Amino acid sequence: MTTIAQSVFCFLAGFFNFFLLYFRKTSRAYCKYQVVKYHSNIPMSPLTTHRLLTVKRKILVLDLDETLIHSHHDGVLRQTVKPGTPSDFTIRVVIDRHPVKFSVHERPHVDYFLSVVSQWYELVVFTASMEVYGTSVADRLDRGRGILKRRYFRQHCTMEVGGYTKDLSAIHPDLSSICILDNSPGAYRKFPHNAIPIPSWFSDPNDTCLLNLLPFLDALRFTSDVRSVLSRNMQALPETQSVQYY
C-alpha cells in the first residue's frame, strides 16, 4: 500500500512540476505577444505639425545588455534568470579564437518599442560589448528593417574607474538633439543631462518599462533642446547592479 501511495505521490508531483513549467512558458509568451497599441498615428493638429517641422530630428542612443536584452553564454546562467527560461534567440560568435554561444532574452515589447520610436528618432546602438557580439544582437533586433544601422561598440568607449563611459559627442556634436537610454549611469556620467535612465532587466516577463517610455519619448521630440527636459531628472538610478560586458 505504501508503495502504491508513493507512486501516486511521485506521479502527482511530476505532473504538477510539468504543469508549472508549462504555465510559466505560456504566461511569458502571452505577456510578450499580447496586443499593445500606442496611438502614435493619430493625426496631429496643424499647429503641432508645424512645431515638429521647426525642430531638428532627434537621435536616440540605445544600449543593449540589460536595457533591450539580457544574454548569457554556454550554460552560464545568471542568478536572475530562472532555469528553464527559453531564450528568444541564440547567436554564435568567435571570441579569442573560441566559439561561444549566447542565449539572448528580449526585454518585453522591445520589437514594438523599436518599431514606434524609429518613426520619431534616428536610432543608434551604443554598447560597451565587443563588436562581434553587439553586431549579431543588433542584427537580430533590427529584423531587416534597417532601423539600427548606426552602431558603436567597446572600441568607441572610454575605460575609466568603474567601467566604460560613452562619448555622445562622437555620435553627434550637437548635444541638444541627442539622448541616451541606458541602464548603467556610469555609461553616461559625462552626459547626465542627455540621459534617460531605465532599470536593468534580466528576465521579468511582466516588465513594461519600454512601453511606459513611449509617451515621454513622443513628447520629447518636440523640444528644441532635450537637455532642458532631461536635466530636471537628476535622480539617476543607483549603481548597485553589476554590469556584464561581452
From Swiss-Prot:
Gene3D superfamilies the UniProt entry points to: HAD superfamily/HAD-like
Residue spans crossing the bilayer: 3-23
Gene Ontology terms: biological process: nuclear envelope organization; nuclear membrane reassembly; positive regulation of triglyceride biosynthetic process; regulation of nuclear division
Enzyme class: hydrolase
Knocked-out gene: effects: Excess of internal nuclear membranes in oocyte-derived pronuclei that are nearly or completely bisecting the nucleus in embryos during nuclear closure. Increased phosphatidylinositol (PI) production and ectopic ER sheets. Nuclei contain openings through which imported proteins passively diffuse. Increase in embryo nuclear size. Twinned nuclei after mitosis. Simultaneous knockdown of chmp-7 or lem-2 leads to enhanced nuclear sealing defects.
Record keywords, A-Z: Hydrolase, Membrane, Nucleus, Protein phosphatase, Transmembrane, Transmembrane helix
Catalytic reaction equation(s): O-phospho-L-seryl-[protein] + H2O = L-seryl-[protein] + phosphate; O-phospho-L-threonyl-[protein] + H2O = L-threonyl-[protein] + phosphate
Protein name from the UniProt record: CTD nuclear envelope phosphatase 1 homolog
Source organism of this protein record: Caenorhabditis elegans
Lineage: Eukaryota, Metazoa, Ecdysozoa, Nematoda, Chromadorea
Gene from which the chain derives: cnep-1
